[in-house]
Amino acid sequence: MTDQSNIKDANVYDEHGNPMNREYDLGRDGAFIGYRILIGQFYTSGDMSAPIEALKMKGFHVDNVKNEFEFISKLRFNDYQIAWVISASSIESPKFVSTLIDFHSAGGAIFLFADNIPYICHASEFLYEKFSIILTGNYPGNKTLRFRENGHLNAGYFGQHEIFTGIKNLFEGVTICHPVYLKPKNQTSMITVATATDGNPCIALFDPPSDSTEGRLCLDCGFTKLFINWDSPGTARFVLNVSCWLAKANK
């Protein structure tokens, strides 16, 4: 399955209009054996068991750590293809951002999660150093985004992209932030693919050119979907689709 949000021939749909069954995910179950994900869960209050089990169904090996020093050590000395970063309100290690930049520059892919202020720090500091982008905001969203081809810049919509395969309706998050581009030219680096119901970007992607050594990157601005809203419209499939896309593997 690739690049198909509006699937019309599924046998069963959920209450939100999204096709049920994992065959409509971007990646097949078991197809990602050998791919390793390191999760830096710096916002430690949430239960990550559901996302981790879902990733394992796709074949990913997943390690979840809750402090920066262990995250830095593992990212430097273990063979991970993807890093998840779930932001907290402050950064402890002065080496965190540089380590993440080195990982990304060498081809590592990153899934950045932020939420309302102050839970933006890890993602925002990385984005500032890498792209001159900061995160801000505390929008009480709690609504559902809808698919519209080429509608990604319209409030309340997401557009056509592989990461939205099998998703017609997608929960935006509860209290969410948004990116601010400090240099206008960098608006072409991180591409908005979904816009929250307040009109601000809420999901953005970086897909490096073919001659670049950098990895792919996704920013999601409402991370409570990983914890208390895992069963919200489209969430589980979206998180899995992004992880498969980050692996640069359509399997």
PLM features per residue range, with description:
Residues N169-K251:
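C-terminal and late-domain segments of enzyme folds
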Residues K56-F60, I101-A109, Y128-S132, A247-K248:
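Sec-exported extracytoplasmic/periplasmic mature domains
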Residues M1-Q81, D115-N116, P208, L226-A236, ...:
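Aromatic-Pro/Gly-enriched surface loop or interdomain linker
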Residues A31-G40, K74-S124, D220, V242:
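Short alpha-beta junction capping motif
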Residues S49, E53, S98-I101, E125, ...:
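Solvent-exposed, polar/charged alpha-helical surfaces in well-ordered, non-transmembrane soluble domains
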Residues F32, M57-G59, S105, Q187, ...:
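Short, well-ordered coil/turn elements that cap or connect secondary structure elements
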Residues D63, S90, G137-Y139:
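Short, solvent-exposed cationic patches
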Residues M1-R36, F113-N200:
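An acidic, glycine-rich "communication" segment
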